Amino acid sequence: MKKYFLILASFMLVACSSSEQNLTYSTKPILNITSSLSPLIQVETTQKSAVIKNKSQQLLNISYHLYWYDHLGVTQIWENQQESYSAQFLLKPQEQKSIDLTKPTVESKNYRLYLK
């Protein structure tokens, strides 16, 4: 009886295991855009840059925060002891801008870009 219980328990554990990759090990950049800005811009990201294009006919004031993470998902700290780099810029109608995504540490593997 014990033997059957152990076999059944083993099958249940195998069935419950997941082969999906954990998000902390993802190498795909994370992009967050506020709902009011999202329909007005187009964004393309790579590991080294992000290109933001103003699709609207109005001048946009865009602020962003850039967070970098190591291979375990731990936030990397910038030289000034901040967890993110922040900046803002203006985009004229139909204009596009490229943001260079400088890594704060050699351990930095993936980033999250938050646009608002």
From Swiss-Prot:
Q: Which residues form the signal peptide?
A: 1-15
Coiled coil (UniProt feature): none
Q: Which cysteines are joined by disulfide bonds?
A: none
A Pfam family (short name) is: DUF1425
KW Hydrolase (keyword) present: no
Alphabetized, the UniProt keywords read: Signal
Extract the PROSITE patterns matched here.
Answer: PROKAR_LIPOPROTEIN
The answer to keyword ATP-binding applying to this record is: no
- Spell out the protein name for this chain: Uncharacterized protein HI_0960
The organism is: Haemophilus influenzae (strain ATCC 51907 / DSM 11121 / KW20 / Rd)
